[in-house]
Amino acid sequence: LTVYGLKRPLQLASAGGEYPAISSLAAAVRKTHPGAWIDLAHPASWDLPLLVAHGAVDSVRVVHGQFCRDEVIDRQTGLRERDKARYPGADGLARWSQQIYFHLLNCGLRIPPTAASLSGEVPNPVGYNRTYVHLEGPFSAGEWWQGLRAGQVTVGNGPLLLPLVEGKPPGCVFHAPAGAAVELQPLLSISYRSHEPLRYLELIRNGEVEYSLSLDDYVERKGNLLPLKFEQSGWFLIRAVSEISHTYRFSITGPYYVQIGSEPHVSRRSAEFFLDWVYERARMIRLDDPEERRQVIDAHRQARDFWQAAVARAAAP
């Protein structure tokens, strides 16, 4: 976790290990530092389902420190391993990180993505991985954080994406009554380096590629992407990947949401993905003290209940 907005040094009860549960530490931050922002530093963090279930995550760092200017660091310590047969190479690492985030969105959770360079820890210059926030008025730090909370973001290290859908930035929720349909026209402006052409541009809908456009397609359409029609709740975002061989350079917009009726989009498959993850993580707990073990196991049981409830209310496959 990375915590922003602290007014004084953070006093931690533990320097690491299983006890207390990291969700308890995050809760202590919320209590003692009102207004602090908690960013999950990697989507594959073993404790992601636990932290999300306890309301301890304000944002997820989808563009993280493994993505470097001249390489992709494909070494995972303390992270949930991906299936490298299914997600091979640098592209696979990026798709795995994004897919975890998409599963969160598929559970009806409206958590914005972020980016960070980890300059000083990995071979990245300051500002390589970037979080852009759309502001309606003059810049201020407070307005920037409010814009991030609203999901009005584009994150990445590749092309700068400036989307508008029906005149709205990312984070917008389009509402419609039950039984109605929502038709939307995405408009996108892209800024990229001439020596790093666009490899592809995709619209992601409910975690799947809805369609892909080449740069020629984009230019021909003059920034007007293909229209979308929703007859059920869901979400979508835009992803762009650069044509570059020595690293993986990409950008994604924050998601747009469509809510038809009273319920957001919740996928059973995505909820089960995190429920299985909670069980797998709980089996890793090693604590000798009975009381410490009881407290930590209880935190994981609460997370299990959260994801079981998500499975129960899922209306989508």
Each model region followed by its residue ranges:
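Catalytic cores of extracellular degradative/oxidative enzymes
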Residues: 1-109
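C-terminal functional module detector
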Residues: 28-29, 33-36, 46-49, 102, ...
